[in-house]
């Protein structure tokens, strides 16, 4: 076949949190278990909250990074607790045996906050020693310091790597590290509701709006810091109230952070010219600091692991600039949602709660419809067998018949060698089979080379693309929408892609080594690691009625994976139309803030998962916004019944039509002999022979685990050794 194609919190000392390890005597401390979380966010409750339990002995813990072995930039914000009436002046602090005298401030709960700077690359042993009536007590915090430019845990960095600092107004940078000095600029919010540049933050113009943060009215002036971390350009925005004071608190900050993530999916090799966006009235008007980086945009970097590293490093810098945070909320749609889900699972506590919108579970799971839609579109254009528009739509599964075309036009080139190369990557360095076989390959898989490895025969990243045994149109056949003859012709002519991403007549075959590595790395989001202990409000802006790739079944795909892992009480799905986007976003942000606040205030017994479920705010649960803008509570399920499903019907996609279960976690199915009793259709003897020739090794058996499927190795995997 032919192939074409209002700050509302008080002193920083209110920040509470249990310790992973409490240290008394000569012992070793670990980082926060609850980290930056605090008692309450509203003013009344914050004032009434207890001052905090005094430690029985000396303790030290990292605040700016919950994983002290992954600290970067030569400094770390720490909290020290001392026994009795001792003060920080009574303590002897050393790093690797040498006396240091960093500045500390006393917090409201009696602990001491300070920044340990000047750390050497590698291991630093920060020790606090005090004399008490019972003798000398010590606590030690081992910190492993990494370069600000990275990497930390993501493994060897891509080269070449093209810089784009000038797109952000920063100085030009040199490859491959793309470092540039940080700069601060200012904007203000006008009374007309827009942001405008401002040269002097101490002198806002007459049309400047005001914002109330922590019961204090301030000019709505925004401080924006830009610089480079982990080879990414980062941005941090917060209400300006003078120079940030990490040890004294900032009257313009509510001590909470929103971290934004951007969409897309592409192969990297460049810095990126945008972030997830930080100048956002929804967040800033409530007193949040907002942060992001260019490597937190999946279209610049389709690796959730690199994104996790960049987010961790940028967040560390935020906390060392502004001080401890109560919690961090993730935000972003599409590829931004992928990063939230995947980081929450594989690198938990970088974000404490997530607000994914128009979500997908992970990049690999979206490969199915990307490839399938390219193949199906090509097949239906080339075949001599007639398929009606209704039959084609049923085979593809989407509500809108053009959704498959949208998938193909948006992302099919991301599996090819050079079809999606960013303009920042010079043509001269790009791969060419004849003239530049060692050149840059731009496929999205390039971003996970450290996890999957390379095929030594081709130099390409080992592929997880596979459609062997996939019975395209199976559900359509079983429902009588297509005939056995059409089913046979479809599966005979569908073809696949080769290692360069080009359409070929043969079906795609995954690299078996890549399959096992993908599952081990949690690149197929299991939903069973950190995500099981992360509050989730999945914002499903319903777009199925048009040719849009962001179809609603994906929220339920992720839910099904979480159900398979034994819990879904931490996920809320909220469906709405475009007319309710602002209302839904505002509600979800405030609800998540309250949810995290409630959890932090819960000192009762139970697992983290128990606390998530029992501290969900009253009124928060599955539901939707009706056409009149009213939000209703209604338990949601895939293809369930009720007012919400009637208003927002959920359909399918090509792999679900082909019989794959809702969890959609099979990269390559195991095979079983054809069983004609499962089709609900009559095949002639000749047709049976034809179908067996189409599937000589059998068809997908979804009652068995996927080939290579295994539990992930765990959270916080370090790929530093390559």
Segments from the language model and where they lie:
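Secretory targeting and sorting signals
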Residues: 2-31
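C-terminal His-loop and adjacent cap/lid subdomain of alpha/beta-hydrolase
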Residues: 35-722
């Amino acid at each position: 076949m032919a192939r074409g194609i209002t700050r509302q919190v008080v002193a920083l000392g209110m920040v509470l949190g249990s310790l992973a390890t409490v240290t008394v005597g000569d012992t070793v401390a670990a980082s926060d278990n609850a980290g930056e979380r605090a008692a309450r966010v509203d003013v009344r409750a914050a004032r009434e909250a207890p001052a905090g339990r005094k430690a029985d002995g000396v303790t030290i813990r990292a605040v700016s990074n919950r994983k002290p072995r992954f600290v970067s930039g030569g400094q770390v914000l720490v909290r020290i607790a001392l026994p009795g009436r001792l003060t920080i002046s009574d303590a002897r602090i050393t790093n690797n045996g040498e006396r240091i005298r960093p500045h500390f401030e006393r917090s409201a709960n009696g602990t001491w906050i300070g920044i340990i700077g000047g750390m050497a690359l590698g291991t630093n042993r920060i020790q606090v020693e005090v004399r008490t009536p019972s003798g000398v007590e010590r606590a030690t915090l081992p910190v492993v310091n990494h370069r600000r430019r990275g990497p930390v845990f993501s493994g060897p960095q891509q080269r070449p790597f093209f810089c784009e600092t000038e797109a952000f107004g920063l100085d030009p940078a040199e490859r491959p590290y793309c470092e540039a000095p940080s700069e601060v600029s200012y904007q203000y919010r006008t009374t007309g509701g827009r942001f405008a540049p401002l040269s002097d933050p101490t002198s806002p113009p007459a049309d400047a709006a005001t914002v109330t943060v922590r019961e204090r009215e301030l000019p709505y002036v925004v401080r924006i810091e830009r610089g480079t971390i982990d080879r990414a350009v980062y941005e941090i925005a917060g209400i300006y109230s003078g120079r940030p004071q990490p040890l004294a608190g900032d009257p313009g900050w509510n001590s909470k952070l929103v971290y934004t993530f951007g969409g897309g999916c592409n192969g990297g090799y460049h810095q990126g010219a945008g972030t997830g966006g930080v100048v956002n009235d929804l967040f800033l008007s409530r007193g949040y600091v907002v942060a992001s980086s260019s490597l937190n945009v999946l279209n610049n970097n389709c690796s959730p692991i690199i994104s996790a590293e960049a987010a961790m490093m940028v967040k560390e810098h935020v906390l060392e600039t502004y001080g401890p945070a109560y919690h961090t909320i993730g935000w972003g749609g599409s590829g931004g949602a992928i990063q939230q889900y995947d980081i929450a699972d594989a690198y938990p506590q970088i974000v404490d709660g997530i607000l994914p919108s128009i979500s997908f579970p992970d990049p690999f799971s979206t490969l199915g419809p990307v490839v399938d839609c390219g193949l199906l579109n090509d097949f239906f254009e080339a075949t001599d067998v007639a398929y009606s528009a209704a039959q084609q739509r049923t085979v593809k599964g989407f509500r809108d018949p053009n959704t498959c075309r949208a998938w193909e036009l948006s992302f099919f080139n991301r599996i090819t060698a050079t079809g999606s190369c960013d303009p920042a990557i010079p043509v001269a360095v790009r791969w060419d089979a004849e003239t530049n076989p060692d050149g840059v390959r731009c496929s999205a898989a390039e971003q996970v080379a450290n996890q999957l490895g390379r095929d030594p025969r081709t130099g390409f990243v080992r592929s997880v693309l596979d459609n062997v045994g996939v019975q395209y149109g199976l559900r359509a056949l079983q429902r009588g929408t297509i005939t056995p003859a059409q089913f046979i012709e479809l599966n005979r002519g569908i073809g696949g892609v080769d290692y360069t991403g080009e359409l070929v007549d043969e079906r795609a075959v995954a690299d078996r080594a890549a399959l096992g590595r993908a599952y081990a790395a949690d690149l197929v989001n299991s939903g069973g690691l950190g995500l099981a202990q992360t509050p989730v409000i999945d914002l499903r802006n319903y777009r199925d009625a048009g040719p849009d790739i962001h179809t609603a079944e994906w929220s339920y795909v992720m839910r099904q994976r979480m159900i398979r892992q034994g819990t879904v009480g931490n996920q809320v799905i909220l469906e709405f139309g475009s007319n309710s986007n602002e209302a839904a976003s505002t509600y979800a942000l405030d609800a998540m803030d309250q949810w995290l606040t409630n959890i932090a205030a819960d000192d009762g017994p139970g697992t983290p998962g128990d606390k998530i479920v029992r501290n969900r705010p009253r009124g928060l649960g599955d539901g939707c916004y009706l056409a009149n803008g009213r939000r209703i509570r209604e338990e949601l399920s895939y293809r369930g019944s009720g007012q919400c499903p009637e208003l927002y019907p959920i359909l399918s996609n090509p792999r679900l039509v082909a019989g794959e279960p809702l969890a959609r976690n099979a990269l390559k199915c195991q095979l079983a002999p054809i069983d004609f009793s499962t089709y609900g259709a009559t095949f002639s003897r000749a047709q049976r022979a034809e179908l067996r020739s189409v599937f000589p090794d059998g068809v997908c058996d979804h009652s068995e685990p996927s080939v290579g499927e295994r539990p992930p190795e765990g959270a916080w995997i370090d790929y530093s050794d390559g």
